């Protein structure tokens, strides 16, 4: 389980634990519901088969409320009700788990997100209302993490 994962990362060293903690905090922020034991990654030297670094963060496809349907987007209350049903795969609560590993550095980065706004792309965008709901939810999750 998650204790064995943390123990493994701790045996690898501080930079690995930092990467694990960064992943937990990001997953809490974006509500990544698909972090499972098959996607904790490492970079491996293909000649020696030795772990050389934590992998960059990956597999965030099931995050930012990507399965919210039309009914969930009718109002912010409906969106919040939908969002509140989402749970992580490998622990019980996104925010509580992230708070366990939150560092001063994480808090500094999170504070910068209190005013976060999506920058619209010239061609590829979600509907304005959905982006507004996502921004508001990110702000709320930042506040929950910082409390």
Where are the language model's segments positioned?
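Phosphate/dinucleotide-binding and metal-coordinating scaffold of catalytic cores
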Residues: 1-25, 29-32, 37, 42-147
């Amino acid at each position: 389980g998650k204790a064995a994962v943390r123990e493994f990362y701790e045996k690898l060293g501080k930079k690995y634990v930092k990467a694990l903690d960064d992943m937990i905090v990001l997953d809490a922020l974006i509500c990544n519901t698909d972090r499972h034991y098959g996607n904790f990654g490492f970079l491996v030297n293909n000649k020696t088969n030795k772990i050389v670094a934590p992998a960059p963060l990956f597999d965030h496809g099931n995050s930012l409320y990507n399965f919210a349907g039309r009914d969930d987007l009718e109002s912010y209350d409906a969106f919040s009700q939908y969002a509140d049903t989402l749970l992580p795969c490998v622990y019980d609560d996104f925010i509580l788990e992230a708070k366990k590993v939150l560092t001063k550095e994480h808090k500094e980065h999170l504070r910068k997100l209190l005013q976060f706004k999506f920058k619209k792309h010239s061609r590829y965008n979600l509907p304005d209302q959905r982006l507004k709901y996502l921004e508001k939810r990110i702000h709320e999750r930042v506040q929950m993490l910082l409390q």
